[in-house]
Regions:
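Long amphipathic alpha-helical segments used for membrane anchoring, targeting, substrate engagement
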Residues: 2-19, 288-435
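Residue-level signature of catalytic and energy-coupling elements of molecular machines
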Residues: 16, 42, 78, 107, ...
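Conserved helicase motor
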Residues: 161-166, 220-224
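Short, surface-exposed connector motifs at secondary-structure boundaries
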Residues: 127-132, 154-158, 184-186, 211-216, ...
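Conserved phosphate-handling catalytic cores of large alpha/beta enzymes
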Residues: 171-175, 183, 195, 199-209, ...
C-alpha cells in the first residue's frame, strides 16, 4: 500500500545527501518535499503540516554526531514522528465484561461484516475466547446470510434472531442468550449504509445506549482515502467510538487514511485487515507500520507469523529427514503449505527489509506456487518419495500432466536440489555450533 510514499520519502531524504549538518536552508527544502509526499499519499493537509513542522523542529534541535549523517538523522526523526502520528503504541482491545460486548459500525462495503468474523476468529484462536456473532442488519438478508456462512467457516455461533425486526431488541436478546450459555465475547454486526444518514446514526446510537458495549469499533475501507477520514469524524462525533479498524490495507491505495485518521479523530487504530482470508488480521503496531513506510520491513511481525505457524513436531520430522538425506517432494510440499499459512506473498515480502525495492516492478503473487504444486501433484507417489527416479521420460510426463514445460520442470528440480543442499549445510552448521 505504501510503495509510492516510501519511494517519495526516500527521494526527500536524498536532498540532505552530502550535507555535513542540518541547517535552516537544507531542512526547509527536505521538509517541503516530505510534506508534498504526504499530500500526494492523500494525507489530510492539516495533519501533513503539523507532522512536517514537528519533524523540522526536532531536526533543528538535534546536534548531529559526526558518526550520524543528516540524512540518517532525518530518517530516524521521520520514523519516530510517523509512529507518534499513528498512535505511538499498539492499543489493546477491551475484553472486560461478562460477556464483553463489541459493537461494530461503518458504511456498507467497508468490510464490516467480514471483519466481524475475522475478529471472532482472532479472539477464538489467539485469546481462547468463546465468541458469539450477532447479525443486527435487519435490512439486508444477504448480510445476515453472509455472517452465518462466515460463522460456519470459523466455527463460531451466529445469533440471527429470526423474526425480530428491531435491531435494538435483537442485540439485547443476543446478549442475554450469551450470558446463559457462557460466551466470553459478543460481537454485534450492525447495518451499513451507502452514506452517512440521520436514520442510521440514530439507530446505531440507540443500539449502543441499550447494550452499553465495552468497545465500539469503527470499520473503514483504507482504499477510500480522505473520505475515510471524513466519515470517521462524522461517526465519532455521534458515536464516540473507541477505536478504528482499517480494512483492505493490502490494496493499492495511497495510504493517507492510515496516517491521518488517528490525528483527526484522536482514537487509536486497533486492527488492520490485510486480505480476504479469515486470519488476515493484524494488531496495528504504529512503530512497525512506520518501519514499512520507510522501507525498513517489519521483521518482528514476520517472526511472529512464523512462530504462530511453527509446528515443532513437523520441524523435528523434517530435520531428521534432512540429516539422513531423505528430504523429498512430499516434505517440500509440506514446507510450502506452512509458508502459505503465514499470509500472502506480497504481504510477507513487504515485511523483509529492502525487499520492496529489490522486487520493484515485479508482480508478487501467490500464483507463483501453483506451477510448483502442479508439478509435484503430477508425480507418482514413488517419484515424490524418490527424486532420483526422475529421468527424461518421467519429466516429460510430469510437464504434460501439470500443464507446464520441460524447462519449468527442470528449473524447479534444480531449485529443489539447491534448497535441499542449503538446508543440509545449515543443519550441519547448527550442529557444529552446539559442540
Amino acid at each position: 500500500m505504501f510503495d509510492n510514499l516510501s519511494e517519495r520519502l526516500e527521494r526527500s531524504f536524498k536532498i540532505l545527501k552530502g550535507e555535513g549538518r542540518i541547517t535552516e536552508i537544507n531542512i526547509a527544502e527536505t521538509v517541503k518535499d516530505i510534506r508534498k509526499a504526504l499530500l500526494e499519499a492523500d494525507v489530510n493537509y492539516k495533519t501533513a503540516k503539523q507532522f512536517t513542522d514537528e519533524v523540522k523542529a526536532k531536526a533543528l534541535g538535534q546536534n548531529v554526531m559526526t558518526a550520524v549523517r543528516p540524512g540518517q538523522l532525518m530518517v530516524k526523526i521521520t520514523h519516530d514522528e510517523l509512529a507518534n502520528l499513528m498512535g505511538g503504541e499498539a492499543a489493546e482491545i477491551n475484553l472486560k465484561g461478562n460477556p464483553a460486548v463489541i459493537l461494530m459500525s461503518g458504511l456498507q462495503g467497508s468490510g464490516k461484516t467480514t471483519f466481524s468474523a475475522k475478529l471472532a476468529n482472532y479472539l477464538q484462536t489467539k485469546k481462547n475466547k468463546k465468541v458469539m456473532l450477532v447479525a443486527c442488519d435487519v435490512y439486508r438478508p444477504a448480510a445476515i446470510e453472509q455472517l452465518r456462512v462466515l460463522g460456519e467457516q470459523i466455527n463460531a455461533k451466529v445469533y440471527t434472531g429470526e423474526g425480530e425486526a428491531n435491531p435494538v431488541i435483537k442485540a439485547q436478546k443476543a446478549i442475554q442468550e450469551a450470558k446463559v450459555y457462557g460466551y466470553d465475547v459478543v460481537i454485534v454486526d450492525t447495518a451499513g449504509r451507502l452514506a452517512v444518514d440521520e436514520q442510521m446514526m440514530q439507530e446505531i446510537a440507540a443500539i449502543k445506549q441499550a447494550i452499553d458495549p465495552q468497545e465500539t469499533l469503527f470499520v473503514v475501507d483504507a482504499m477510500t482515502g480522505q473520505d475515510a477520514v471524513n466519515t470517521a469524524k462524522e461517526f465519532n462525533d455521534r458515536l464516540d467510538f473507541d477505536g478504528v479498524i482499517l480494512t483492505k490495507l493490502d490494496g493499492d491505495a495511497r495510504g493517507g487514511a492510515a496516517l491521518s485518521i488517528r490525528s483527526v479523530v484522536q482514537k487509536p487504530i486497533k486492527f488492520i485487515g490485510t486480505g480476504e482470508k479469515m486470519d488476515a488480521l493484524d494488531v496495528f503496531h504504529p512503530s512497525r507500520m512506520a518501519d514499512r513506510i520507510l522501507g525498513m520491513g517489519d521483521v518482528v511481525s514476520l517472526v511472529e507469523r512464523a512462530q504462530e505457524q511453527y509446528d515443532e513436531e513437523e520441524a523435528r520430522r523434517i530435520s531428521k529427514r534432512i540429516a539422513k538425506n531423505q528430504f523429498d517432494f512430499n516434505d517440500f510440499l509440506s514446507q510450502l503449505a506452512q509458508i502459505k499459512k503465514m499470509g500472502s506473498m506480497k504481504d510477507l515480502m513487504g515485511m523483509i527489509p529492502g525487499m520492496d525495492k529489490a522486487l520493484k516492478g515485479v508482480e508478487v503473487s501467490d500464483d507463483a506456487f501453483k506451477p510448483i504444486e502442479a508439478i509435484i501433484s503430477s508425480m507418482t507417489p514413488q517419484e515424490r518419495s524418490n527424486p532420483s527416479l526422475l529421468n527424461g521420460s518421467r519429466k516429460n510426463r510430469i510437464a504434460k500432466g501439470s500443464g507446464t514445460s520441460i524447462v519449468e520442470v527442470n528449473r524447479f528440480l534444480k531449485q529443489f536440489e539447491q534448497t535441499s543442499k542449503m538446508m543440509k549445510k545449515m543443519q550441519q552448521m547448527q550442529g557444529l555450533r552446539r559442540r
